[in-house]
């Protein structure tokens, strides 16, 4: 029930946001003209000042009305929505942004209903006549209705909200709104709050004071920045490694969605966000800060651009204060959180990492059909921030894997096509994505920057390509079966138990020498393995490392081979102190013969119990049976 309610709220909020988002540049243009040409602006100009009022009183409401109508019924809905909005605009003396958000969709729904009723009932040759006159007549009727009803109603609502806001401000209660705003943002309602609520309120407020505090309540990047920096210094696991880059993206790029997964993995961190938001709003109220228009995206650069003359100090102090409060409180919670790592006598499991580990992803991927994937869409609420970054990461990995037949796009959830092959969304947005594209395959993730997720997805796509290639025709199947005995197969000689190494370089040397000893590679291949490790760690997570040579070392490979080495005391392979490998698998690949063997080993290592047994077994036969998934 709660999920359904949340989904309904998200859908409604998304609709409101979609009316505002396409017109953000108009808000910015209006704000910049305010900052330049108004009497308190940088270049006051009475002549050019006349351009400002028509934009806020006519242009913006009409565009919002058109956008709202077109969301319901295309261009016809947009046209009748614009006509209906004219009735709202002329009925009052205040900017009718809220009125346009009602009248536009009303016009769209009306024309959509009318078109459905007359479908297939208009005689040939009269379609254009009926379409044009029906839209004009219905538009006039709706404009009159909105003039006498919607306009006065919105004027009363605006007066009521204005009075309520004055009461809140007079009792200094505005900072308490963070208790609602910050948790709502985590559930991807940030665009709804900013563009559906605060933008209309801010514009009405800015007409009186030339700036408004409401433009900086949701868009303040300080609380999110403080949380991410705290993760960078005191966090554990994979998220701490990506938090530094995420902080830069959030602060300068204005993509607040990037810190949401950090809170979802540790819900207690919502407290620092609330405290940071409250402190920022308190400073704004105290120093009378605010912006001249919507700051979108919520970047420090956008905020500075929308800051009116004389308010830079108050706005910067507000952002800085919210950052410090969020950082200090987040650091305290993270530094003294001893539940991040659970240890037993034999095995170390990192909770934070397990939430985003490759094993979980592999298990999830087993239920999907990758045989006809040509288009992958990474989608988020607005289709511009977090999904764009996720798509960029996946696109690069797809290219590196030579999967040139697969294209990767980023898109807003409401714009998803019905026939998309595979759609990737945050787990909190997947239900909405399924509603928009019910016939597509959907995969959920918790963090758009999760490299392990994309690595495992690409691995599955590559495995599928190998499978399709091997099963393309019956003749290929027979040929593959005939050559099966000639391919590399894991045996007891390839399993080396009870090894010890003080560091990963020593471990790679041990594995490499066994590859040389068994005739798989030349001796210089070991140097290539060490060189490859310097480029990027071959640590896979889940106590496994997969060292191998560089592409240039192909000539040093005599034949395809794999060496499975067990290090019961572990060897640190990753950047984190807890990235300990107990199982080190060395690979020498002459061609693609190793892919199926590695795939089988990967499937065998899907279970925690299997990894733990392999890490401490003293029986080569048991290890071989576990790796090949055959009974002893």
Swiss-Prot record:
CDD domains: PTS_IIA_fru, PTS_IIB_mannitol. The chain crosses the membrane at residues 24-45, 50-70, 134-155, 165-185, 273-292, 313-334. GO terms for molecular function: kinase activity; protein-N(PI)-phosphohistidine-mannitol phosphotransferase system transmembrane transporter activity; protein-phosphocysteine-sugar phosphotransferase activity. The keyword NADP does not apply. The active site is at 380 (phosphocysteine intermediate), 548 (tele-phosphohistidine intermediate). InterPro entries: PTrfase/Anion_transptr (IPR016152), PTS_EIIA_type-2_dom (IPR002178), PTS_EIIB-like_sf (IPR036095), PTS_EIIB_2 (IPR013011), PTS_EIIB_2/3 (IPR003501), PTS_EIIB_mannitol (IPR029503), PTS_EIIC (IPR003352), PTS_EIIC_2 (IPR013014). The record marks 532 as: Stabilizes the transition state in the phosphoryl transfer from HPr to EIIA. Residues 12-341 form the PTS EIIC type-2 domain. GO terms for cellular component: plasma membrane. PROSITE patterns: PTS_EIIA_TYPE_2, PTS_EIIA_TYPE_2_HIS, PTS_EIIB_TYPE_2, PTS_EIIC_TYPE_2. Its main location: membrane. The keyword Transmembrane applies. SUPFAM superfamilies: Phoshotransferase/anion transport protein, PTS system IIB component-like. It is a multi-pass membrane protein. Residues 488-630 form the PTS EIIA type-2 domain. The EIIC type-2 domain forms the PTS system translocation channel and contains the specific substrate-binding site. The phosphoenolpyruvate-dependent sugar phosphotransferase system (sugar PTS), a major carbohydrate active transport system, catalyzes the phosphorylation of incoming sugar substrates concomitantly with their translocation across the cell membrane. This system is involved in D-mannitol transport. This is PTS system mannitol-specific EIICBA component. It comes from Buchnera aphidicola subsp. Acyrthosiphon pisum (strain APS) (Acyrthosiphon pisum symbiotic bacterium).
């Amino acid at each position: 029930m709660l999920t359904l309610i949340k989904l309904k709220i998200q859908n409604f909020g998304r609709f409101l946001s979609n009316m505002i988002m396409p017109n953000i540049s108009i808000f910015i243009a209006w704000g910049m003209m305010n900052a330049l040409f108004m009497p308190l602006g940088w270049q006051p100009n009475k002549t050019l000042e006349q351009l400002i009022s028509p934009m806020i009183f006519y242009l913006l409401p009409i565009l919002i009305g058109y956008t709202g109508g077109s969301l319901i019924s295309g261009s016809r809905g947009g046209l009748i929505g614009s006509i209906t909005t004219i009735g709202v605009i002329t009925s009052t003396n205040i900017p009718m942004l809220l009125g346009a958000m009602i009248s536009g969709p009303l016009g769209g729904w009306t024309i959509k209903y009318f078109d459905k009723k007359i479908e297939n009932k208009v005689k040939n040759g009269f379609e254009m006549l009926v379409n044009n006159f029906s839209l004009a007549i219905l538009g006039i009727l709706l404009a009159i209705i909105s003039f006498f009803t919607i306009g006065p109603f919105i004027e009363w609502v605006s007066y009521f909200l204005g009075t309520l806001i004055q009461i809140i401000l007079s009792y200094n209660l505005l900072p308490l709104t963070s208790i609602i705003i910050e948790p709502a943002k985590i559930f991807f309602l940030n665009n709804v709050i900013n563009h559906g609520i605060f933008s209309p309120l801010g514009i009405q407020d800015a007409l009186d004071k030339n700036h408004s505090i409401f433009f900086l309540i949701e868009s303040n990047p300080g609380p999110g920045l403080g949380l991410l920096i705290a993760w960078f210094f005191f966090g554990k696991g994979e998220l701490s490694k990506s938090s530094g880059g995420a902080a830069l993206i959030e602060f300068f790029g204005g993509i607040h969605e990037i810190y949401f997964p950090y809170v979802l993995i540790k819900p207690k961190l919502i407290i620092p966000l609330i405290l940071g938001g409250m402190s920022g709003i308190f400073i704004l109220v105290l120093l009378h800060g605010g912006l001249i228009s919507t700051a979108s995206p919520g970047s420090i650069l956008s905020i500075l651009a929308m800051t009116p003359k004389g308010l830079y100090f108050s706005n910067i102090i507000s952002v800085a204060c919210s950052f410090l409060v969020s950082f200090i409180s987040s650091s305290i919670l993270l530094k003294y959180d001893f539940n991040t790592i659970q240890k037993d006598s034999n095995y170390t499991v990192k909770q934070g990492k397990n939430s985003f580990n490759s094993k979980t992803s592999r298990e999830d991927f087993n239920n999907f059909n990758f045989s006809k994937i040509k288009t992958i869409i990474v989608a988020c609420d607005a289709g511009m921030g977090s999904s764009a970054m996720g798509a960029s990461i996946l696109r690069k990995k797809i290219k590196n894997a030579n999967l040139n037949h697969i294209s990767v796009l980023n898109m807003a959830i409401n714009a998803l096509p019905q026939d998309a092959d595979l759609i990737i969304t945050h787990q909190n947005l997947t239900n909405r994505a399924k509603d928009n594209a019910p016939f597509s395959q959907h995969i959920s993730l918790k963090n758009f920057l999760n490299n392990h997720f994309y690595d495992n997805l690409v691995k599955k796509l590559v495995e599928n390509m190998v499978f399709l290639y091997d099963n393309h025709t019956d003749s290929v199947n027979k040929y593959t079966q005939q050559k099966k005995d000639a391919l590399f197969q894991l045996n007891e000689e390839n399993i080396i138990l009870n090894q010890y190494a003080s560091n990963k370089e020593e471990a790679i040397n041990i594995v490499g020498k066994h590859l040389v000893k068994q005739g798989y590679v030349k001796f210089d291949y070991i140097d290539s393995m060490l060189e490859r490790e310097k480029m990027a760690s071959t640590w896979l997570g889940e106590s496994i490392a997969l060292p191998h040579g560089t592409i240039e070392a192909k000539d040093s490979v005599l034949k395809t081979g794999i060496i499975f080495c067990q290090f019961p005391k572990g060897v640190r392979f990753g950047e984190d102190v807890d990235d300990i490998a107990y199982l080190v698998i060395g690979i020498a690949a002459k061609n693609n013969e190793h892919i199926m063997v590695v795939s089988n080993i990967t499937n065998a290592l899907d279970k925690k119990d299997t990894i733990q047994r392999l890490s401490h077994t003293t029986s080569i036969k048991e290890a071989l049976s576990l790796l090949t998934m055959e009974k002893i």
